[in-house]
Amino acid sequence: MKCFIGTCMYLTVAIVCFACNTMQQKEATTLPVSVNIAKVNFTLNSGIANVNKLPFTGTIFMLYPNTTDTAEVRNYLNGYEDGEWRKYYTGNNLREKRTFTNGQKTGSYLVWWPSGKQQQVYNFKQNVYEGTCREWCENGILIKEMNYSKGYETGTQKAWWDNGKIKSNYIIKDGRRYGLLGTKNCINVSDSIFK
């Protein structure tokens, strides 16, 4: 019985120590840090963002030259792209917004024209296109509407010229294209993952 109680106490102490150690490590790597890229030694090494040769956790921002206007804001966790990224036109008008999770593109990738009108809405899941992706020309006319599943074209695919006339309109069924392709080089879509 003493052996059992001793073992239970040892396990309890070990669990508490491990939990505290894990919490301390997590706190140390997720402290909010925001730095100007021009003020630090920032490098990308094999896809890992480093500041002063260590994997970076925090926010990196860039300014337009000779201004205080933000050009870009990126977030990293342990050197990997993580969280929201934003790019701006001069004058702080939003140009792009996207999300990463542990180095992979996730969620919506949104792009705007300098006028503030929507230019693109692409959706990602685990680093590849997922769902409906759309593009508009600067005057607001829809010029592309594509559907994806796990990075592959699927279902209805449509594209228009800038004047609104149809460019291509086809369906993907069983990995093959049917309809108006609007291309000269037909490629088997079952071999094409879009990222």
Protein language model regions, located:
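Bacterial Sec-dependent N-terminal signal peptides
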Residues: 1-29
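Glycine/tyrosine- and acidic-biased, solvent-exposed loop/turn segments at the edges of beta-strands
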Residues: 19-195
